[in-house]
Amino acid sequence: MGSSNLNINSKITDIFAYQVFDSRGVPTVACVVKLASGHVGEAMVPSGASTGEKEAIELRDNDPKNYFGKGVNEAVDNVNKVIAPKLIGLNAFDQLTVDQAMIKLDNTPNKAKLGANAILSVSLAVSKAAAKAQNSSLFQYISNKLIGLNTTNFVLPVPMLNVINGGAHADNYIDFQEFMIMPLGAKKMHEALKMASETFHALQNLLKKRGLNTNKGDEGGFAPNLKLAEDALDIMVEAIKLAGYKPWDDIAIAIDVAASEFYDEDKKLYVFKKGIKANILNAKDWSLTSKEMIAYLEKLTKKYPIISIEDGLSENDWEGMNQLTKTIGSHIQIVGDDTYCTNAELAKKGVAQNTTNSILIKLNQIGSISETIQTIEVAKKANWSQVISHRSGETEDTTIADLAVAAQTGQIKTGSMSRSERIAKYNRLLYIEIELGDKGKYLGWNTFTNIKPKNFNI
């Protein structure tokens, strides 16, 4: 992964980290890496609100007098005082050696000593500096040098745009965390984002007409005080039509249930805030068993133009996820996020057990770009789809847009058509589309190679 031939100009000469803020106004880590050539790489790391138990550790100061314990001075110090002295002099083109040096320095299974936020900030900044030193776009550098694809033809990702927020990302009654639109009928990246923008604004107008608030959640989607998943799905379908598009054919729906957030481990039940409709599955006490949850999700896919379900069951309910995949996975994308936490070993376990047919990829869940690529490669080998993802606490860093193109994942999940930290990724993709010209393809429905979507009429 990366060249080990040391060019004097590719030597790392300086590494400097400092504290900045994410999109929620919470501290996070930024890093600057300088090379002997004079090239500079800069990176900022994101932070999640709904986090998996098996994620690499995001190091916080836990000092209640500073940012209510959310400061990252310790992580910053770890970069400046521990990591930097060990990495200065290394070859920036040898990403694997750089990342492994930090992992060895940390010497914990989950990066608890130095912090995944510290390690990732350096990992990303090194890759950016190296790309500049090679006079290459970041996506081309990652693809050719880190992944080894050696291609000039790329796939532009279908976006999953979060238009209604619930769960841990919004202060409303909706239990499911994200309701997203996927412009699968588009032929080009810019056309897909046009469709998404028009649908987003059509939805805003519908919400206003119904007296529902149009405040935004963490990821830029609306957070109306709806009670049920069905309420959100109904108004989304209406918005797609109002924007002049056909539900399913032009724009399909993806949902992130984030079921771990409302799963009661002791009772082994999925407990809804206000409950789903009483007549659904004869649910009692507004809670569902794993089997009932699967039946509920299946029912939703028959009623609404849903193509993708993420974290439909708890991250520890592997048997349930397996059953969900068996039930609807032939034609619906079943994405594992908290289940795998971008961990290659967990992904291998999922492949062996047929737990899902897709994986969500988040850089900060594992904590380095080389480990992220390793997890993507596990999924590709299994013919699973991969979805590159942002976090709810984002920054203006656009690395994930380049990563999605570089790894040819075909899908990206990076928020709504509002909030500049989300739009930055879409704008980067628009530039990449122009840069690639006819060497960049937007696959639309053809992005799904391991499922056979059924025709859906609504």
Curated annotation (Swiss-Prot):
The organism of origin for this protein: Mycoplasma genitalium (strain ATCC 33530 / DSM 19775 / NCTC 10195 / G37) (Mycoplasmoides genitalium)
Pfam families reported for this sequence: Enolase_C, Enolase_N
Primary site of residence: cytoplasm
Reported function: Catalyzes the reversible conversion of 2-phosphoglycerate (2-PG) into phosphoenolpyruvate (PEP). It is essential for the degradation of carbohydrates via glycolysis.
Protein name: Enolase
Entry's Gene Ontology cellular component terms: cell surface; extracellular region; phosphopyruvate hydratase complex
PROSITE patterns per UniProt: ENOLASE
GO biological process, any: glycolytic process
Enzyme Commission number: 4.2.1.11
Active site residues per record: E219 (proton donor), K362 (proton acceptor)
Any GO MF annotation of the entry: magnesium ion binding
Binding residues for Mg(2+): D256, E310, D337
The keyword Methyltransferase is assigned to this record: no
Binding positions ((2R)-2-phosphoglycerate): Q177, K362, R391, S392, K413
